[in-house]
């Protein structure tokens, strides 16, 4: 468990958007895709995930990792089939965004949605790299409460609004990770795809870069930190993160 504590501590979490949505007509959207992670809580009506026959009740949640396409049905009854491109072009015909905080969770055929980034050392998309599919979370009161609070803050202009939203978005990420671990979900994927996050040499490199800007960050110095050869350090870093170390430093 200590390994996952280190991973969570390394995560850079950024809030992207919050939406309180009323479903205007029943639709089935093919290949819904977003680079950001999305968590949705159903308030009233129906949401279905293609390939998953689980019955979803009000209060249940759906998590979609960034970069994972999903076919989703919103609303009850026979849906209209549309592409994601058509949905984005005519979004206002299908969804109504609501901004009155007193209506959150009180409107028929509605849901709340939060989108966010979660990157290990601000470089690697954590949930994307785990290669896990979208999944439902049954009646998780804490996650539901966090989403409600973020939606409420997002509708306000109170002092400290941004700070509250950032803190609660970080809590959402932690609760999702805890849910996955507690329920032993995706055990094989976690064992395979989280290994490199636990590599102490990689953690040493990330920590050194973070603490040494704008000092000596040459490959030679990074190799000394990780105790690998200068010729190998670039290949090693890219193999584990998908990016060259100097590109990461510039980013």
Q: Could you tell me what each predicted segment is?
A:
Residues 13-17, 147:
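Short alpha-helical hairpin
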Residues 110-193, 197-207, 232-234:
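An amphipathic alpha-helical interaction segment
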Residues 175-181, 204, 208-251:
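Basic/polar phosphate-binding segments, predominantly the helix-turn-helix DNA-binding elements
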Residues 3-7, 17, 125, 142:
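Exposed alpha-helical structural elements
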Residues 1-12, 133-138:
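A short, N-terminal "cap"/entry segment at the start of jelly-roll beta-barrel domains
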Residues 17-127, 156-159:
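N-terminal regulatory/effector-sensing and dimerization cores
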Residues 105, 154-158, 191, 219, ...:
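A short, mixed-charge helix-start or loop-turn motif at secondary-structure junctions
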């Amino acid at each position: 468990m200590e390994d996952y504590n280190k991973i969570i501590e390394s995560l850079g979490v950024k809030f992207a958007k919050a939406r309180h949505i009323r479903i205007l007509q029943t639709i089935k959207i093919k290949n819904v895709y977003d680079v950001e992670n999305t968590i949705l809580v159903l308030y009233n009506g129906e949401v279905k995930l293609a390939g998953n026959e689980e019955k979803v009740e009000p209060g249940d949640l759906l998590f979609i990792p960034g970069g994972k396409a999903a076919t989703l049905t919103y609303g009850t009854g026979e849906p209209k089939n549309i592409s994601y491109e058509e949905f984005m072009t005519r979004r206002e015909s299908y969804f109504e965004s609501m901004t009155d905080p007193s209506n959150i969770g009180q409107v028929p055929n509605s849901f709340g949605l939060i989108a966010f980034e979660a990157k290990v050392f601000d470089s690697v998309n954590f949930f994307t790299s785990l290669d896990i599919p979208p999944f439902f979370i049954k009646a998780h009161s804490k996650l539901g409460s966090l989403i409600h609070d973020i939606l409420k803050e997002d509708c306000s202009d109170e002092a400290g609004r941004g700070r509250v939203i950032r803190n609660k978005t970080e809590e959402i990420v932690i609760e999702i990770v805890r849910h996955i671990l507690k329920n032993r979900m995706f055990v094989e994927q976690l064992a395979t795809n989280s290994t490199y996050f636990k590599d102490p040499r990689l953690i040493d490199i990330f920590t050194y870069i973070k603490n040494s800007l704008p000092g000596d960050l040459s490959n030679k110095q990074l190799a000394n930190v990780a105790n690998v050869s200068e010729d190998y350090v670039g290949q090693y870093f890219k193999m584990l993160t998908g990016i060259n170390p100097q590109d990461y430093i510039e980013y």
